[in-house]
Amino acid sequence: MEAGPSTASPGVSVSPAPALTAGEVQLLKVPQKRFYRQRAHANVFIDHELDYPKRPELMDWSTHYPAYFSQPNEDGTITQGEKKVEWADVGCGFGGLLMALAPLFPEKLMLGMEIRTSVTKYVTDRIAATRQAQSLLPADSVDTKPGGYQNVSVIKANSMKHMPNFFAKGQLEKIFFLFPDPHFKNRKHKARIITPALLAEYAYVLRPGGILYTVTDVKDLHEWMAHHLHAHPLFEYIPTETLSDDPILEAARTATEEGQKVERNKGDKWVACFRRKEDPKEEDED
């Protein structure tokens, strides 16, 4: 178990966006969550209005990462560049993890996947506002963040159905499942984000050596997720103490809005991280 609060600044402005001058504030409207209210969870089994590619190479990333991807060609075809999305925050909520990690790892393209419409809109606006704030700063400003948040985006998606539509085999380096819906009732367990069937898909898009992070404040859910990950042949447990100095794990524990709420309530956080194993070698035929 990983427990104990960490310091975090809740704030109402975009965090960790830089402080702006009074003139810049007039130019920039920072989104506020109270205008993006929606239910805490969504039914993943109903058909939502979702756009997703038939296969990863057909995904147009130019609207998400305009600094890294060119727009589709005149004939509608897409030219894939060398950069790929490598980190995915599944059920990213209001984007706290993404905004914390983006300036720490400006060379990594990271994507939040969120099924709720209003929450996705909030994160989209939050990223746009933060990018604009960065563009208003002088190049030599101490508040300028590496990458200017051009490496982060969000998409409305049902990760339980469409992960392989967005990501090729072995494309992802890190996948985060932070404070997911616990689905307490037994009949609802099939809707949990970690199941044997779903782990097969996560193992497909996660490269060997990649890490899957889980954090929750619900002990039963922690034990459920850890049990299924331990049982899967393509994942191996990483002792949490070996990641004690990992800024990514610290952000996973403390940067999300849910994580900060748990800290304010002095609750426990349960952490389990697993590494993707190498694919088993095929035995030579006699």
From Swiss-Prot:
The active site is at residue 181. S-adenosyl-L-methionine binds at residues 91, 114-115, 158-159, 178, 256-258. InterPro entries: SAM-dependent_MTases_sf, Trm8_euk, tRNA_(Gua-N-7)_MeTrfase_Trmb. One of its GO terms (molecular function) is tRNA (guanine(46)-N7)-methyltransferase activity. Pfam families: Methyltransf_4 (PF02390). It is found in: Nucleus. One of its GO terms (cellular component) is nucleus. Its EC number is 2.1.1.33. The keyword tRNA-binding applies. It is an enzyme of class 2 (transferase). Belongs to the class I-like SAM-binding methyltransferase superfamily. TrmB family. Catalyzes the formation of N(7)-methylguanine at position 46 (m7G46) in tRNA. Forms a complex with TRM82. This is tRNA (guanine-N(7)-)-methyltransferase. It comes from Cryptococcus neoformans var. neoformans serotype D (strain B-3501A) (Filobasidiella neoformans). The lineage of its organism: Eukaryota, Fungi, Dikarya, Basidiomycota, Agaricomycotina.
